[in-house]
Amino acid sequence: MGKSRGDKYRDATDGKKDAKKDLNELKQELAMDEHQISLDELYARLGTNPDTGLTSEQAKTRLDRDGPNALTPPKTTPEWVKFCKNMFGGFSLLLWIGAVLCFIAHGIPCWCAGEPYLYDNLYLGIVLAAVVVITGCFSYYQESKSSKIMESFAKLVPQYAVVIRGGQRIDAPAEALVVGDIIDVKFGDRVPADIRVIKASSFKVDNSALTGESEPQTRTAEYTNENPLETKNLAFFSTNAVEGTCRGVVVATGDRTVMGRIANLASGLEMGATPIAREIAHFIHIITGVAVFLGVTFFIIAFILGYYWLDAVIFLIGIIVANVPEGLLATVTVCLTLTAKRMASKNCLVKNLEAVETLGSTSTICSDKTGTLTQNRMTVAHMWFDNKIFEADTSDDQSTANYSRASSTWMALSRIAMLCNRAEFKPGEETNPVLKRECNGDASESALLKCVGLSIGGVTGYRTDKPKVAEIPFNSTNKYQVSVHQTDDGDERYLVVMKGAPERILDRCSTVLMEGQELHMDDQWRESFNNAYLELGGIGERVLGFCDLRLPADKFPRGFKFDIDEPNFPIEGMPFVGLMSMIDPPRAAVPDAVSKCRSAGIKVVMVTGDHPITAKAIAKGVGIISDGNKTVEDIAAERGVPVSQVNPREASACVVHGSDLRDMTPAQIDEILENHSEIVFARTSPQQKLIIVEGIQRMGAIVAVTGDGVNDSPALKKADIGVAMGITGSDVSKQAADMILLDDNFASIVTGVEEGRIIFDNLKKSIAYTLTSNIPEITPFLIFILADVPLPLGTITILCIDLGTDMVPAISLAYEEAEDIMKRMPRDPFRDKLVNERLISMAYGQIGMIQASGGFFVYFVIMAENGFWPSRLLGLRKQWDSPAINDVADSYGQEWTYTQRKRLEYTCHTAFFASIVIVQWTDLLICKTRKNSIYQQGMWNHHLTFGLFFETTLAIFLSYCPGLEHGLRMMPLRWTWWLPVLPFSVSIFIFDEVRKKFLRTLPPGNWVERETNY
């Protein structure tokens, strides 16, 4: 039995509900307990053996059941669908309708009379169709170029993994891993699946792409947190192992991994229309409304005036088509493409042309911290020794060091940092500046290595001369690292060096090194230590303590066997040497970029997975939290009261912890967004980033989200515009984004915002310029119907304007320099439209009417010079257009044949065309600016100067080129017929300069602004 229609409908509805339900489930925090239960219980659940792993048969069965360990590729739009969207979407649809109407207008006389009266409508229909096809192909080509760049990015999935199968240690393709496999991961590998750690040796992973934490995270077999993303006994698919080794059991593969869930969350989100797409749709509604209104009105008038119904229908179609700005689709496409190219040269790759303008509409930027605002490179920022805090010198020549590099305490501190350190420079990096050298090892240890490499130099040789004989690696229980070294400095004693958490190091020290002297550790010194530790930790820096000790030669002679499992050498009673603190520093250009955003009315919100203290410190460093603005915690600390006693609305800044966000309702999130101007969200999960973006969008903001990690991809997809990082960004984030920063620099976004605002302004100018000539193109047709005069302007001539003389000048406005755009508030997408009633009023009702008046003046002048006074022209249409009448008398009684009349009519068409070109000169100049005088703006846009030259040259060519009187019905003009329209052109310039003077000088909100400022 087949399903009834009702059943099918219910199935479809249920499918949508299920999809929505699945998406809501993905938005929930991770629900898993594999990290909480004991290992034995986990082995039993997964049916595996920690020593022998799975058998080949078990692995094959599970692979068949669960599928390969790979992320399902995101659904891509078929190329033919992309092509059709460019061919039939938005503005193209209006032109297609125009083309169809032209074919109908051509076909009606053919159908009724057996042969067409004129081929104008056929030509117009063909040209309209050609315009759509050419611009559609052009847009498709631009988008496909961007997608090819996207396809060239590296693949995410690791290729091979070391797995225990049937007791054998083998290399297997990562895609063949299944739940229950026992795998080994070592330094340099990419974790091939979600694993529960069974045992680990100094194992650290870089989780920055997944959680946003800039420091490598230690992974051990112990369960430390109920949150799967924060516990130490889980390592996740596609994160990188940066130190040590680990054995683990696979608990999830493919789409069921944390990475897979996030990727599915991103691909499951629905994307709304871009602001520019909504603007173009709004514009089409306006143009269609005006066209249909005029068409129907004059159809009724023509009917009342006694026109035959067939003629009235052709009039109706003609007026609708005359309202269609044929060249505007090409103009908008080319303008967006030019801006996209300009942005690409400034390191912004636009995947979708419409995203160009969206960035300019942005009112809130949600930025990731690690790698976007910061350099994703841990750097030593401060040192504390000899009871003073010193700023680290990061200059290549060490010219800004404010401490003595010869200080014995500094030499001792740098010696420990060099020796108690597993990081090393990669081979072949010797010729590069120290700060730019690639390192193998932990990010913090690499920072120490570069710091002492800059200050002391020769790290590799120094280590060779002082070989390591024993080492206790750092672990999360002891929180320190110890190594024992032989030295070549004439001292036969072994040197023990130690670094770690400052409080743990302090516990193992009884004296302190001060200016080369070993002194007793008193309470005053301890207070200084605590103050320094709190100060450095309070600005978000990771602080490490350092100490060393010479072992007595009689007890520890050369060749002594050191035991690291149960140390047989002293690791207490050591002299404390100093502190060194590190931070992932902000990018140099970011503070200025944030300042520009603020002056442009754009709110910058930090959303990071990193620690709140670090996030707050970076936010203050880059200006997201301004100087003087305080959080609730700052106010409470100042007053010496609990945080609960401070009204949150007193604080303009706010740092929200992910654990607090988890328990908030949408209304509470909205309250935070409304009441705080400067916001930092820290320790957020990918699901929470998405919820934050949705909350900001609920406030009516247009949101741009920046990020490089997989954890950013759902938010990137949901945002009005997602901006991914090209260098450090994951493939998942690049797929989800609309734009890619090729240099990973937040400052490039501000460039993008500026370009987006410029293009919105310049598109307005182009549209205003293009629409204005619609009135002198439509009114001849209306007068032709109402006054029954010979047609002042032909259809073919209109095409010469729309697709000829107007095109290059309209496109040249895309190059116009900005007026105060980065000092304005972001545009309100609901009120500040690309085409609003004020623009229509200016283009159609004011400038357009002056242009039409100029055209009619020229028309009547030429007719009068040839004997037809205006009074004689009224009601003359039927006689004039009849091929059978060859004796139409003019005002002086001279008789005109049909051929003579048509030659005069085509001369009038050409003159009307020339007059439109001349008034469009001035229209182009006044469209250069929206408020500034042309004398303020200047004529520095050379493309516009070329546009003026081009349209004039083309008009002269079309008017005087032999043979065009047959193809385009263009007749040579007397030079005097170019002159009558000049006063109208000058009056347009004077009118608009006076209007702009009022806009600049009258108070904001004045009537001129309300009525004419588009």
Curated annotation (Swiss-Prot):
Natural source organism: Taenia solium
Gene Ontology BP annotations: intracellular potassium ion homeostasis; intracellular sodium ion homeostasis; potassium ion import across plasma membrane; proton transmembrane transport; sodium ion export across plasma membrane
Binding site for Mg(2+): 708, 712
Xref: Gene3D superfamilies: Calcium-transporting ATPase, cytoplasmic domain N, Calcium-transporting ATPase, cytoplasmic transduction domain A, Calcium-transporting ATPase, transmembrane domain, HAD superfamily/HAD-like
Keywords, alphabetical: ATP-binding, Cell membrane, Ion transport, Magnesium, Membrane, Metal-binding, Nucleotide-binding, Phosphoprotein, Potassium, Potassium transport, Sodium, Sodium transport, Sodium/potassium transport, Translocase, Transmembrane, Transmembrane helix, Transport
Compartment(s): Cell membrane
Stretches for region Disordered: 1-20, 48-73
Biased composition (Polar residues): 49-58
EC numbers for this chain: 7.2.2.13
Family, similarity comment: Belongs to the cation transport ATPase (P-type) (TC 3.A.3) family. Type IIC subfamily.
Listed Pfam families: Cation_ATPase, Cation_ATPase_C, Cation_ATPase_N, E1-E2_ATPase, Hydrolase
Protein name: Sodium/potassium-transporting ATPase subunit alpha
Tissue: Preferentially localized in muscle cells and protonephridial ducts, and in small quantities in the tegument of cysticerci.
Membrane topology, from the record: Multi-pass membrane protein
Organism superkingdom: Eukaryota
Complex and partners: The sodium/potassium-transporting ATPase is composed of a catalytic alpha subunit, an auxiliary non-catalytic beta subunit and an additional regulatory subunit.
SMART domains: Cation_ATPase_N
InterPro entries the UniProt entry points to: ATPase_P-typ_cation-transptr_C (IPR006068), ATPase_P-typ_cation-transptr_N (IPR004014), ATPase_P-typ_cyto_dom_N (IPR023299), ATPase_P-typ_P_site (IPR018303), ATPase_P-typ_TM_dom_sf (IPR023298), ATPase_P-typ_transduc_dom_A_sf (IPR008250), Cation_transp_ATPase_P-type (IPR050510), HAD-like_sf (IPR036412)
Lineage, top ranks: Eukaryota, Metazoa, Spiralia, Lophotrochozoa, Platyhelminthes
Job of this protein: This is the catalytic component of the active enzyme, which catalyzes the hydrolysis of ATP coupled with the exchange of sodium and potassium ions across the plasma membrane. This action creates the electrochemical gradient of sodium and potassium ions, providing the energy for active transport of various nutrients.
Reactions that this protein is recorded to catalyse: K(+)(out) + Na(+)(in) + ATP + H2O = K(+)(in) + Na(+)(out) + ADP + phosphate + H(+)
Record-level Gene Ontology MF annotations: ATP binding; ATP hydrolysis activity; metal ion binding; P-type sodium:potassium-exchanging transporter activity
